[in-house]
């Protein structure tokens, strides 16, 4: 078994909506990013890549490459997952924690889980997404942006 951890953060800026877990969430501000700014999928992709010892999302999809400008993070996740599977890994489970004062995430979490399960070709019971605040403390608590942490468990196929 291999465990990976991922983290991402983006500042608010511009106009909404924001995209988290592949879900478009209405909000007055967007997230500043080279791609679509989906911190949930970026953290998850990093966790998966880390567990497989394949580096990180910035190595695979550099923000200096114009090809990834405005990129759909679901596509990035699917490509990373293809590479991980090519190394002989299967998914145990993933757990994603979104850290934001606003907007409220609860109404959107079920669809995030659906999208992640679709993108990883796994069962819903292998995907958990939750959200928390920092009780108005720090960067996210002041409403300056959104952060996310994710962990992933991989297993060698047939092991």
UniProtKB/Swiss-Prot annotation:
One of its GO terms (biological process) is isopentenyl diphosphate biosynthetic process, methylerythritol 4-phosphate pathway. Its cofactor is a divalent metal cation. GO terms for molecular function: 2-C-methyl-D-erythritol 2,4-cyclodiphosphate synthase activity; metal ion binding. Homotrimer. It comes from Cronobacter sakazakii (strain ATCC BAA-894). This is 2-C-methyl-D-erythritol 2,4-cyclodiphosphate synthase. Binds 1 divalent metal cation per subunit. It catalyses: 4-CDP-2-C-methyl-D-erythritol 2-phosphate = 2-C-methyl-D-erythritol 2,4-cyclic diphosphate + CMP. It is an enzyme of class 4 (lyase). Involved in the biosynthesis of isopentenyl diphosphate (IPP) and dimethylallyl diphosphate (DMAPP), two major building blocks of isoprenoid compounds. Catalyzes the conversion of 4-diphosphocytidyl-2-C-methyl-D-erythritol 2-phosphate (CDP-ME2P) to 2-C-methyl-D-erythritol 2,4-cyclodiphosphate (ME-CPP) with a corresponding release of cytidine 5-monophosphate (CMP). The record marks 34, 133 as: Transition state stabilizer. A divalent metal cation binds at residues 8, 10, 42. Pathway: Isoprenoid biosynthesis; isopentenyl diphosphate biosynthesis via DXP pathway; isopentenyl diphosphate from 1-deoxy-D-xylulose 5-phosphate: step 4/6. 4-CDP-2-C-methyl-D-erythritol 2-phosphate binds at residues 8-10, 34-35, 56-58, 61-65, 100-106, 132-135, 139, 142. Keywords: Isoprene biosynthesis, Lyase, Metal-binding. It holds the Pfam family YgbB. Signal peptide: none annotated. Its EC number is 4.6.1.12. The keyword Metal-binding applies. Belongs to the IspF family.
